[in-house]
Amino acid sequence: MGEMEQLKQEAEQLKKQIADARKACADITLAELVSGLEVVGRVQMRTRRTLRGHLAKIYAMHWATDSKLLVSASQDGKLIVWDTYTTNKVHAIPLRSSWVMTCAYAPSGNFVACGGLDNMCSIYSLKSREGNVKVSRELSAHTGYLSCCRFLDDNNIVTSSGDTTCALWDIETGQQKTVFVGHTGDCMSLAVSPDYKLFISGACDASAKLWDVREGTCRQTFTGHESDINAICFFPNGEAICTGSDDASCRLFDLRADQELTAYSHESIICGITSVAFSLSGRLLFAGYDDFNCNVWDSLKCERVGVLSGHDNRVSCLGVTADGMAVATGSWDSFLKIWN
């Protein structure tokens, strides 16, 4: 038996010991805990607005903290900031590269960012003195595509990349402050904790990792998926995370219990998940799928309680407003829909 084989066996034994130790700490399952709860009634949501203006597939969207404006990025090479109350376009920003994969709205509302196959994160100032929108920074150091970006504040942004790393940037200097190394596959998505001190990443190595922004270290790793993790989000209280994967399941992991609590899947669902988001209370989980639908799950009872159908192509992105009053879905059919 080669040295490599021996080490592999040792690693597997250690993994098993860790799994057993976690199980020993689990005093109750989620199913047992919520056995007395009724399933949420049928969730029926209507399309309240359809945002028309993109001319090609929409790849990403992100709500502003005011729950009114949102930014979307499309293969047509445009970044559009929408007023969702009126469906008007507040800004239509032409991009230098049309191969965009992600976009983000700064918490302050002063900036938006985007990036993709150009390996860069471009920051746009919405509040320039001249009134026009212009590139204020181009952050380039990643050696792979930019899959996701999220602002911490007006001067700090976190990015995830196909080069397997995540990075924290100082926007003012354009430099990487910290590089987060640990994934062994393309990093596909990230989400920032409600207190902005931690972030989570999901990758093609089928694992999710929790990172400490200030320390630059990986605090926890969550495994269980059988394929790429495409989407990830925090539970509203910041104490659990949800992942969506190409294995057709979403999974809920508890940070304090350090393990998976449950999975959301159904034998009739055989396609991958592109996006995930919780309702404000956390009771509902919205998940966008390759089959053109967005399924609504009761996060505690793990049952499907609704479906948002109306798109004519893959639902590529979705998001719930900060005030919890609406959910937006974006699709390869070039439209965004606002539901409640």
UniProtKB/Swiss-Prot annotation:
Which tissues is it found in, per the record? Expressed at a high level in the heart and at a much lower level in the brain.
WD repeat coordinates: 53-83, 95-125, 141-170, 182-212, 224-254, 268-298, 310-340
**Gene Ontology BP annotations:** cell volume homeostasis; G protein-coupled receptor signaling pathway; regulation of cholesterol metabolic process; regulation of fat cell differentiation; regulation of gene expression; regulation of glucose metabolic process; regulation of hormone metabolic process; regulation of phospholipid metabolic process
Keywords, comma-separated and alphabetical: Repeat, Transducer, WD repeat
- Which cysteines pair up through disulfides? They are none
What PROSITE patterns does this protein map onto?
WD_REPEATS_1, WD_REPEATS_2, WD_REPEATS_REGION
GO CC annotation terms, alphabetical? cell body; cytoplasm; dendrite; heterotrimeric G-protein complex
One matching Pfam family is WD40_Gbeta
Write down the superkingdom of origin.
Answer: Eukaryota
Q: Which InterPro entries match?
A: G-protein_beta_WD-40_rep, Gprotein_B, Guanine_nucleotide-bd_bsu, WD40/YVTN_repeat-like_dom_sf, WD40_repeat_CS, WD40_repeat_dom_sf, WD40_rpt
Q: Name one GO molecular function term.
A: spectrin binding
Q: What does this protein do?
A: Guanine nucleotide-binding proteins (G proteins) are involved as a modulator or transducer in various transmembrane signaling systems. The beta and gamma chains are required for the GTPase activity, for replacement of GDP by GTP, and for G protein-effector interaction.
Family affiliation: Belongs to the WD repeat G protein beta family.
Query: Which PANTHER family does the entry mention?
Result: GUANINE NUCLEOTIDE-BINDING PROTEIN BETA G PROTEIN BETA
Q: Which protein, by its recorded name, is this?
A: Guanine nucleotide-binding protein G(I)/G(S)/G(T) subunit beta-3
Look up and give the organism this protein is from. Rattus norvegicus (Rat)
Gene that specifies this protein: Gnb3
